[in-house]
Amino acid sequence: MPSRIPSSNDPVLPGRELWGTERFWHFAHHEHQGAFDMVSIFVVDVGSRHLSIEDWRKAWSKLYRTFAVLSQKISDDSGEGKIVDGALRAEESFFTGPILQDDQDRIDYSLQQRRFDCLSLTVFATSGTEHESFHLAISNPHALGDAKGIFAIGKALIQGVLSQTQAELQSPTSPPPQPSLKAFTTSHNQDLGLKAMFEVARTGSSIGFPILPKETSAELEPASREWRRVFTFSPAQTETLVQLCKAKALTVSAWLQATILHALIDTLVDDKGDEKAEQTFTVAAMPFHSPLSVSGATSTIFAPISIRVGSKAELNDIAEAVAESFGLARRFAEDVQDDYVKTLLKLFGSVRLETSVPTFSSLGRLDTVTGLKRYHVVARNNLPTTGIHAWTLNDQLNLTLSWAPARFRRDHIEKFWSTWIGTIKEVVA
């Protein structure tokens, strides 16, 4: 199988410069050992169909007709990252993996591979008793697509393989139309520009998970293989939550973000007796503006939000503050995003983070895909950060928490996780 790692003799290929949030994701990848590289896992039940790895290879190759991003790669040959079109053939991005025990093992295996300058597919071997299921991993640099865009590719791949007729298999799946970013902004989309966003960013967060110094973290927290937690709610619990949010005129994403902040206060604030005590949270708000964000440009709004809530604030009060801030972030002017990220990167190296508030990526309700039993998405967490993903698949809400191993106190992680999930359980009981 040809290597996807370019040799030093490869010619310098033409390409376009990175823009906006692409710059940020590539900076993290290049300067911080692949930080935020992504892996998406698809567990597919093929039923009585007798499929082989070769069937997946053919279907992957056919997707190159539909998704231009599959032939793109991030190149650093010129000294600055750029996106190169037509730089990859299907056979260069298809791999097979070994028999592994569970989904987390497949995630760990995928993150250890040098396959993050472009999109690639790994089909894992299965034992004889598991021939009815296939385990797939799509790996990608964040600059080439977000989780929802990669899910769209996985969906098209699965539908292609499971097509009932050869004619269906040969007909490429058309990607959904990609709306403009302006469709998600209001008529006041120029209200927020660089100055407003930098003022918000300077606010910072008053509390967060304390980051252990790298030089002492190994002594304080013994190295652990575990770096991720997952919880899945039942369809009934998920529907209860959806109806609750509708009744409160809130999105599920805003309500979940509020529960995260509420759980952080419960975890980290020992004395909440002062009625006037306030907490400030500043996090990056990155709402997806397209169901398919793999057209060669990342499609997130890199705008920080900041809210102030009392240490004894009720969950509903926090949720309303979050919803208001999300609305504010959506008015961040599109044409200043690139300048904002450029300036942000200049400041990035001069700031030493002391605490971490979990980033929150909500994919919403994903399309039902025939045969898709399970799905996971992760981002490499080798910076001293914490991150949360949320998605609903097959009417079940899935929540994950990931963290950089040995950079946070285990008791903080454990208490936050149990408090957060426990709060949601109480509401949907």
Swiss-Prot record:
Provenance organism: Mycosarcoma maydis
Pathway involvement of the protein, from the record: Secondary metabolite biosynthesis
Family note: Belongs to the alcohol acetyltransferase FCK4 family.
Function of the protein: Probable alcohol acetyltransferase; part of the gene cluster that mediates the biosynthesis of the glycolipid biosurfactant ustilagic acid (UA). UA is a secreted cellobiose glycolipid that is toxic for many microorganisms and confers biocontrol activity to U.maydis. UA consists of 15,16-dihydroxypalmitic or 2,15,16-trihydroxypalmitic acid, which is O-glycosidically linked to cellobiose at its terminal hydroxyl group. In addition, the cellobiose moiety is acetylated and acylated with a short-chain hydroxy fatty acid.
The keyword Transferase appears for this protein: yes
Domain of life: Eukaryota
Protein name: Probable alcohol acetyltransferase orf1
Transmembrane segments: none
